[in-house]
């Protein structure tokens, strides 16, 4: 199979009832373990994100780090981390957002983004869109021009894309 025709869905396994009953977890570790498939995935993501001409990629803790690091290298741009409380040194800016049951908070180092820098936010998966929407809001708080969001996997049935006011590139989509 050539890289152009490789079906990356074949390298992602679904694990039922994880992390709790009724959830089908899409495990990207099987994609990462296959060097050829991982290189194809990173090449396709690079090709998808390049037209946005980002100055910086913003990676959401923790699986967003896995895709953002190789893409930043491929694109020749910087990388910043969006992390949970207490994980970043120095002064941080935070954004708290609601979850189905409770809330969560993301932080960015206060000096990580220069106002007006073009930023693409990256995560492994887009489901309901709550974390990506919060990340976009946080990045705008520090002056970023958020030009897009990129994920490995999108679960279209959950409608997360509709919560975002930036273009979204998903490498793999599941409709159910």
UniProtKB/Swiss-Prot annotation:
Broad enzyme group: transferase
Annotated CDD domains: PRTases_typeI (cd06223)
Keyword Metal-binding listed: no
InterPro entries tied to this protein: Ade_phspho_trans, PRibTrfase_dom, PRTase-like, UPRTase/APRTase
Keywords: Cytoplasm, Glycosyltransferase, Purine salvage, Transferase
GO biological process: adenine salvage; AMP salvage; purine ribonucleoside salvage
Alphabetical list of Pfam families matching this protein: Pribosyltran
Keyword match Transferase: yes
Swiss-Prot/TrEMBL catalytic activity: AMP + diphosphate = 5-phospho-alpha-D-ribose 1-diphosphate + adenine
Pathway: Purine metabolism; AMP biosynthesis via salvage pathway; AMP from adenine: step 1/1
Compartments where found: Cytoplasm
PROSITE patterns: PUR_PYR_PR_TRANSFER (PS00103)
GO cellular component, one term: cytoplasm
Molecular function in Gene Ontology: adenine binding; adenine phosphoribosyltransferase activity; AMP binding
Function noted in UniProt: Catalyzes a salvage reaction resulting in the formation of AMP, that is energically less costly than de novo synthesis.
Subunit and interaction comment: Homodimer.
Protein name in the entry: Adenine phosphoribosyltransferase
């Amino acid at each position: 199979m050539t890289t152009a025709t490789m079906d990356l869905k074949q390298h992602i396994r679904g694990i039922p009832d994880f992390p709790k009953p009724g959830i089908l977890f899409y495990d990207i570790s099987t994609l990462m373990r296959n060097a050829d498939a991982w290189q194809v995935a990173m090449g396709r993501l690079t090709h998808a994100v390049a037209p946005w001409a980002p100055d910086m990629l913003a990676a959401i803790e923790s699986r967003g780090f896995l895709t953002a690091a190789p893409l930043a290298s491929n694109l020749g741009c910087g990388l910043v981390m969006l992390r949970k409380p207490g994980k970043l040194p120095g002064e941080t800016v935070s954004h708290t957002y609601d979850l189905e049951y409770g809330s969560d908070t993301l932080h960015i180092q206060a000096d990580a983004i220069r106002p007006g820098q073009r930023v693409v936010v990256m995560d492994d998966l887009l489901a309901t869109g709550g974390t990506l929407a919060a990340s976009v809001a946080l990045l705008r708080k520090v002056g970023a021009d958020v030009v897009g969001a990129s994920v490995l996997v999108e679960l279209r049935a959950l409608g997360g894309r509709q919560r975002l006011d930036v273009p979204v590139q998903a490498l793999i989509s599941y409709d159910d």
